[in-house]
């Protein structure tokens, strides 16, 4: 397929030079040129993720492009990417960018065109909508898979029907979860055995009673003082493992049970590159993490295509990039619950399945 003509400039959402961090549209940015091992993607849809406001808030980088989850079409390829990726111009792909980066301020999904290393994207199966592909994004490509099978060290693999409460019902494991009561039916339909109200002051104790003091593994996607205490209260008398999604507060952990081994997961490590962030967020380069990701990526795409995994219910919002900033602010205000917000960037005449 002949490569399509490209504009010289495009639009992107970037961090504004404000405190606290806000976002703005950059109207006239040069279209990025892919390096030898990269592909250039024309973005068709983007999805919101909590990291879209959390990372800029922790590590401000004015002018850096924001956004993680996306889907789109390959429009240019570096020569190494042509040889190694198995992709071709015109293929439909999805992935999650490492955005709001001091080292790579051009990286970010909330743009009309993005460049991405070929190994970090996955080819979208036939028949998928742009919205579905974008909605899968960061949660499965990085943090959750890493949290379950690397940080928590679960045995077994997700071969059985595995649908999302905080990701999966894996083979041989019972899953309980927490959410708002309005979402109980949804998470139980996705595979959770039982859901508990995280607003309840006895949430942790209720889980511990339900699991008869035998709960061993806990994944905490919120990772605040309140949720950490709830998770520790839920783990059985014999102790277990706790995994958070944020840097853990040592002062709080020092007051909690020593029979629980606590750690946290940062999906940025799965690029294999150095994570050049300050303080406890720094990570040295780890190529083995990237090798694991490439294998995991192949597995989860197959599971999604077979219908054994699915994203949160998708809410499509119109307005393109101009409305994405409003969406980020709704997440920051915690007004989003039990849904994945997706914004199409294509025009209506091209709407349909991939």
Curated annotation (Swiss-Prot):
Write out the residues that bind NADP(+).
Answer: 51-54, 180-183, 198, 245-246, 336-337
Q: Which UniProt keywords apply?
A: NADP, Nucleotide-binding, Oxidoreductase, Virulence
Per UniProt, residues of the Enoyl reductase (ER) domain are 16-342
User: SUPFAM superfamilies in the record, alphabetically?
Assistant: GroES-like, NAD(P)-binding Rossmann-fold domains
Signal peptide limits: none
Please name the Gene3D superfamilies in this protein's record. Medium-chain alcohol dehydrogenases, catalytic domain, NAD(P)-binding Rossmann-like Domain
* Name the UniProt record assigns to this protein: Trans-enoyl reductase pydC
Q: Which organism is it from?
A: Acremonium sp
Lineage here is: Eukaryota, Fungi, Dikarya, Ascomycota, Pezizomycotina
Write the gene name: pydC
């Amino acid at each position: 397929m002949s490569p399509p003509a490209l504009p010289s400039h495009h639009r992107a959402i970037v961090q504004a030079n404000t405190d606290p961090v806000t976002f703005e549209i950059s109207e006239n940015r040069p279209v990025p040129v892919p390096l030898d091992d990269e592909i250039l993607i024309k973005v068709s849809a983007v999805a919101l993720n909590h990291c879209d406001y959390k990372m800029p808030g922790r590590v401000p980088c004015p002018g850096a492009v924001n956004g993680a989850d996306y889907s789109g079409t390959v429009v240019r390829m570096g020569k190494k990417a042509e040889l190694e990726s198995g992709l071709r111009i015109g293929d439909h792909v999805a992935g999650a960018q490492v955005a709001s980066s001091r080292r790579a301020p051009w990286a970010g999904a909330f743009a009309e065109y993005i460049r991405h290393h070929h190994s970090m994207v996955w080819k979208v199966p036939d028949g998928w909508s742009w919205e579905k592909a974008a909605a899968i994004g960061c949660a499965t490509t990085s943090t959750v898979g890493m949290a379950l099978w690397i940080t928590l060290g679960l045995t077994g693999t997700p071969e059985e029907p595995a649908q999302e409460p905080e990701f999966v019902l894996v083979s041989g494991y019972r899953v309980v979860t927490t959410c708002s009561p309005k979402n109980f039916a949804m998470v139980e339909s996705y595979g959770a055995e039982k859901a508990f109200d995280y607003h309840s002051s006895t949430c942790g104790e209720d889980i511990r009673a339900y699991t008869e003091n035998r709960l061993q593994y806990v994944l905490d996607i919120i990772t605040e003082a309140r949720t950490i205490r709830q998770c520790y209260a839920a783990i059985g008398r014999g102790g277990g493992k706790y995994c958070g999604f944020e840097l853990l507060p040592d002062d709080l952990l020092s007051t909690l049970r020593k029979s629980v081994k606590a750690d946290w997961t940062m999906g940025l490590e799965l690029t294999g590159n150095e994570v050049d962030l300050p303080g406890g967020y720094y990570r040295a380069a780890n190529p083995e993490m990237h090798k694991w990701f490439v294998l995991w990526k192949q597995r989860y795409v197959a599971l999604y295509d077979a219908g054994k995994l699915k994203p949160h219910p998708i809410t499509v919002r119109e307005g393109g990039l101009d409305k994405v900033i409003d969406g980020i602010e709704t997440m920051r205000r915690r007004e989003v619950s039990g849904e994945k917000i997706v914004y199409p960037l294509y025009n209506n005449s091209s709407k349909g399945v991939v």
